[in-house]
Amino acid sequence: MSAASDASVPDGAPPPTAPTRRARLRFLRGGKTRTGLIILAFFVLLAVAGPWIAPYDPDAMSDQLLQPPSGDHWFGTTHTGQDVFSQILVGTRGVLVVGLLAAAIATALSVLIGVSAGFLGGAVDEILSALSNIFLVLPGLPLIIIVASFVPDTGDLVIAVAIALTSWAWGSRILRAQTLSLRRRDYVEAARATGESTPRIILFEILPNLTAVIASGFVGTVIFAVLTEITLAFIGVADISHWNWGTVLFWAQSNQALAQGAWWWFVPAGLCIALLGTALALINFGIDEFVNPRLRTATGSSRKVRMRVGFTPVARKAPGTGHPGQYSSKEPRT
């Protein structure tokens, strides 16, 4: 009996937690996820080190007006001789700070309101759902423009808070719907039966099952916040003395860079916006593939060998034998 049990569990077998660890690392194995994380890490590095590695002061003027890219000015210069490359480097920090801060505040609000409404139910659900519906129907960008116009200093913090307050409602509705489907699960009922408190049930039973939804909402909010901040800077609502990619585009458009043929003034900022948006979208796609098994199955099914149409395996006599012993797919069924 002991020999059989020893044989059933080999010495070199991995611990029971190995499949769980592999499942957790599956998210990082995807090509989309890795590509998105590499691009995002590059921009984070620029945001951290940009002001120190910038070759020039982004506000410093010179006599080299509207010069194309060269060894001295990699991205060319503006109409006042300012270095575009230095402006892009310094502006990267403002873009990521506003995007990440706004997404963090909006995600915290959506988790707090959505999960509380879905789990508690009753009057709490009705009040919080009504609050979410009010913010859903409010036009986000016009409201941000109005708020920014009444604030004397529209810095990164003000813009991030304004974006967060107008972008949490849709995530809250999604989390409420997911929580409604989770609160009657067997493990949640078992936690209630053992006397667990409501905050502990939410923290240890509900939120771990909403991690992927929360992460996807966070990435989506970062994309929305980045585009909103750049839009506000481009139309001149945000403080144009704070450098970001939208500020670069604002000055390029105000001084008719396109009409003057100064493509180097606006193309680098546009490419940075496209690359950052692509990176965040790839990360979001990776989260979807990690959460949705159907997407992983569809990706893997493309590698399967397809049967030849019109031919089916039939039995053939093996050489030297008098009975069918081999199969062939070269003969059509008669």
Go through the PLM ranges and name each one.
Residues 166, 212-215, 219-220, 262-329:
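C-terminal transmembrane helix and the adjacent membrane-cytosol boundary/short C-terminal tail
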Residues 74, 105-109, 118-185, 213-215:
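Generic hydrophobic transmembrane alpha-helix motif, especially the helices
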Residues 93-109, 199-231:
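Transmembrane alpha-helices
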Residues 84-119, 275-276:
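Transmembrane alpha-helix signature in integral membrane proteins
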